[in-house]
UniProtKB/Swiss-Prot annotation:
Pfam families: F-box-like (PF12937). Residues 1-46 form the F-box domain. CDD domains: F-box_SF. Transmembrane segments: none annotated. The lineage of its organism: Viruses, Varidnaviria, Bamfordvirae, Nucleocytoviricota, Megaviricetes. InterPro entries: F-box-like_dom_sf (IPR036047), F-box_dom (IPR001810). Signal peptide: none annotated. This is Putative F-box protein L126.
Length: 255
């Protein structure tokens, strides 16, 4: 077995993703390697290579703030998530336009209440403009669009529909999460139109509409987790959580 000083030297040449991969391999080898992989000094060294938004640097800062109980509650107390649901048929859930629709999702971190404000697919932009331009005081902003597109929507209309909603997100940048709920036929039409866009979005088959609130809740939690600067975790994330966060980015995924 190599001396620890040499092992530290070897690990110091690895970037974060390589270090995580090596951590997985070493966890099955011996306790010495596993302990070195998880050593906070090694992660501090890696954090110095990144800017202030680095998740790894956030971990180090959070570790220094473990005694701040009130900060941790931001990640664990109930989260209100507001969004806008657009549908021409209510194919995934019967919407009553003008009535707020609520779905609850519990993950292992906190309770999430996802509120949809429903609007019809066509002529919805003017209604959305009205609510976004109003002041809501201390209410949370509208985070996301959920857009239901079934086979009754002509294919030739879909590019304009998507362009309109993407344009809204540019005007109101706090709305940058998109969940498209579609039939298989529409998935094939929409996918090439939205691929490559620098937005957080996901396409769901209409049979999996129940997963939309779960996905949105997880996205919002990861943003709170990665971007906050005044809260901390009770403990460092596990190696599997580090691996997920190292790969996490805005991407298009068909569920």
């Amino acid at each position: 077995m190599l001396p620890e000083e040499i092992l530290f030297m070897v690990f110091s040449f690895l970037d974060v993703k390589e270090l995580i991969a090596c951590s997985h391999a070493c966890s099955h080898a011996c306790s010495q390697w596993r302990r070195i992989c998880s050593d906070k000094l090694l992660w501090v060294q890696k954090a110095e290579l990144f800017g202030p938004e680095s998740p790894i640097e956030q971990f180090i800062n959070w570790r220094k703030l473990l005694c701040v109980e009130g900060s941790y509650s931001i990640l664990t107390r109930k989260k209100i998530i507001r969004g806008i649901a657009i549908s021409n048929s209510g194919m995934c859930k019967a919407y009553n336009y003008g009535v707020i629709f609520l779905e609850k999702y519990h993950n292992s971190y906190r309770e999430n209440e996802v509120y949809y404000k429903p609007y019809p697919l066509f002529d919805s932009i003017k209604y959305i403009e009205n609510i976004l331009s109003c002041s809501y005081g201390n209410e949370d902003p509208y985070y996301f669009y959920r857009i239901d597109i079934d086979n009754r929507v002509p294919n030739e209309n879909i590019p304009d529909i998507i362009e309109n909603f993407i344009g809204m997100s540019k005007k109101y940048p706090f709305i940058n999460i998109f969940a498209f709920v579609c039939t298989q036929e529409k998935i094939q039409v929409i996918t090439p139109l939205v691929s490559g866009l620098n937005l957080t979005m996901k396409i769901f088959h209409q049979d999996r509409w129940e997963n939309v609130s779960e996905w949105i809740s997880e996205v919002i939690w990861k943003r709170d987790f990665m971007c906050g600067s005044t809260f901390c975790l009770k403990k460092l994330p596990s190696l599997s959580e580090l691996s997920v966060l190292s790969r996490y980015e805005s991407e298009l995924v068909t569920y």
